């Protein structure tokens, strides 16, 4: 089992969903070779709430994660899918953005969670985007897992979340920038000044 979580991506921001501008070749391949659910909905469109719901299978009113920094307590975590699969004999791992307080190392066989960074130092000292680190850690988990044992890996990619404090909100990696060479990115449909002017100030200023 491999669960991939993307941060702040719209349902139609994938090539597999018919987007002619966005380049998502690997996700498109997964969609072609697997099953694509076209009627799925999130129960609460807030980062940590959705992550807690994915782990627990519960609504926010049940799991109680309503703010950043609040973790799932040990007793309810025992009923999450990683904990249930681990007790059933799966080798479990979590890499990337966790987003629900501080993860406890004992909750997974392999834990490489990191928060609040978009560019990091790689193992050989080079500066890499955290997306690349996510991918490397996931591949290492898959290569090092015990052979003949079922596994469950959750990969929490930061991308395409903006780097909130950066002058340029989206800073591409070299390889991803090459995907868009010669491509004109259309402006957002709701980026028109007339559209923004028609909104109440508390919305148009956000």
Locate predicted features.
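Solvent-exposed loop/turn segments at secondary-structure junctions
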Residues: 8-11, 36, 43-46, 60-61, ...
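Catalytic-site neighborhoods of secreted/periplasmic enzymes
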Residues: 53-141, 145-146, 165-176
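Extracellular/periplasmic catalytic domains that process cell-envelope and extracellular macromolecules
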Residues: 21-23, 29-32, 36, 46-48, ...
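Active-site-proximal N-terminal segment of extracellular/periplasmic enzymes that hydrolyze or transfer
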Residues: 1-44, 69, 86, 161
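Active-site-proximal cap/lid insertion segments
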Residues: 8-21, 117-129, 143-149, 154-206
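Structural recognition of the beta-strand scaffold that forms the well-ordered cores
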Residues: 2-5, 36-41, 47-48, 53-55, ...
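A short beta-strand-to-alpha-helix junction
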Residues: 19-24, 41-46, 70-79, 125-135, ...
């Amino acid at each position: 089992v491999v669960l991939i979580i993307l941060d702040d991506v719209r349902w139609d921001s994938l090539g597999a969903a018919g987007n002619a501008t966005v380049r998502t070749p690997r996700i498109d391949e997964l969609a072609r070779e697997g099953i694509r659910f076209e009627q799925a909905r999130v129960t609460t469109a807030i980062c940590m709430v959705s992550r807690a719901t994915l782990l627990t299978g519960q609504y926010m009113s049940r799991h109680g994660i309503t703010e950043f920094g609040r973790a799932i307590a040990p007793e309810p975590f025992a009923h999450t899918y990683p904990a249930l699969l681990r007790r059933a004999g799966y080798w479990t791992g979590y890499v990337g953005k966790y987003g629900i307080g501080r993860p406890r190392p004992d909750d997974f066989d392999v834990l490489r969670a990191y928060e609040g960074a978009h560019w990091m130092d790689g193992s050989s000292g080079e500066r890499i985007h955290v997306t690349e680190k996510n991918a490397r850690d996931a591949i290492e988990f898959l290569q090092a897992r015990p052979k003949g044992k079922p596994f469950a890996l959750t990969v929490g990619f930061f991308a395409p979340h903006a780097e909130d404090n950066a002058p340029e909100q989206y800073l591409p990696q070299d390889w991803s920038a090459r995907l868009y060479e010669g491509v004109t990115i259309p402006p957002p449909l709701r980026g028109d000044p007339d559209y923004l002017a028609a909104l109440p100030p508390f919305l148009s200023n956000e």
